[in-house]
A protein has these predicted regions:
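Intrinsically disordered, low-complexity linkers and terminal regions
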Residues: 1-157
Length: 157
């Protein structure tokens, strides 16, 4: 019997545990099939932003995943460099506070990826899921971009 994951709303056998199993199976696919591996970081970021009480408890963890989501959607080509800059900034004494969460985390869930068998469809499904999640965090777009800008200037010191 399906029950809803209380964080993302996915109806799945086992609720929270079932949702986590889907996430783990996606990670396994990315590990076993290199055609999907390039998406691993953003899959983790999107899933974390839909499960912030588990994967974004600390302000720094939350900031890393929110900025990762922002960067991938707005500057995919530069995402690796920006993410490295954010990581350096967050590894230092950065004064980051976890902001209030939105009331929901997007209409789409990790289920979008489950049936995408080829990398092109997987990428398209991932982009839809990521965009849905990012849209849910509209109130934090300015914050994410400010954190990115701060991290980039931090690296130039």
């Amino acid at each position: 019997m399906s029950e809803a994951c209380p964080s993302c709303g996915l109806a799945v056998a086992g609720g929270t545990d079932g949702c986590q199993r889907l996430f783990d199976s996606i990670g396994l696919r990315e590990y076993e099939d290199m055609r999907f591996a390039r998406y691993h970081r953003i899959v983790v970021d999107v899933y974390a932003m839909q499960h912030p009480d588990r994967y974004g408890r600390s302000a720094k963890s939350f900031a890393a995943h929110l900025t990762g989501l922002c960067t991938w959607l707005e500057n995919e080509a530069g995402a690796q460099s920006v993410n490295a800059s954010v990581q350096r900034w967050l590894s230092g004494p950065s004064p980051v506070a976890r902001p209030p969460l939105p009331p929901s985390y997007g209409a789409l869930t990790i289920r979008e990826l489950v049936e995408a068998e080829d990398p092109a469809r997987y990428g398209e499904a991932l982009r839809r899921w990521a965009q849905s999640t990012w849209n849910a965090y509209a109130s934090l777009h300015v914050t994410a971009r400010a954190w990115i800008a701060t991290s980039l200037s931090y690296g130039n010191r």
